[in-house]
């Protein structure tokens, strides 16, 4: 693959998951229940997008290593991405299982976990940007040129 998909795909889960937490907060602050179904859909779609983006990142990992990106930098980004997915998966499970007697609903707990998820999402994005802007992951470099000499 000549152009990596991962940098294209990551924007969707970032936007969807962030908006899901925003909708949860708006619903709680404004006392409006109609934000919850939208937040649940955003969480689900954000998780789906996150899984696809993660798979694309794993697919692009070898190319980044071959381009000289340090493995420790890649692993840090990958670990944060997986932790982020795990936190948002917990939120999605909490949302799907709400209303069961054995899982009481705790909006403060949900929102607190959501804030942790947002912090992880931000850190994942930061270190992903580091891979691109510091190490040049996924950046095509021009072929070296030889200086032209004048004929005298």
Where are these regions (language model features)?
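Polytopic transmembrane helical bundles with strong interfacial aromatic enrichment
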Residues: 1-152
């Amino acid at each position: 693959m000549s152009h990596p998909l991962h940098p294209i795909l990551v924007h969707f889960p970032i936007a969807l998951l962030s908006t899901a937490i925003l909708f949860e907060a708006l619903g709680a602050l404004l006392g409006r229940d109609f934000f919850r179904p939208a937040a649940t859909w955003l969480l689900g779609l954000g998780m789906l997008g996150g899984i696809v983006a993660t798979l694309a990142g794993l697919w692009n990992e070898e190319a980044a290593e071959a381009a000289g990106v340090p493995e420790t930098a890649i692993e840090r980004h990958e670990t944060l991405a997986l932790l982020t997915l795990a936190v948002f998966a917990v939120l999605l499970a909490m949302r799907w299982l709400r209303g069961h007697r054995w899982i009481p609903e705790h909006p403060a707990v949900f929102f607190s976990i959501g804030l942790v998820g947002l912090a992880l999402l931000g850190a994942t994005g930061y270190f992903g940007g580091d891979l691109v802007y510091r190490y040049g992951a996924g950046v095509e470099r021009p072929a070296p040129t030889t200086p032209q000499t004048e004929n005298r």
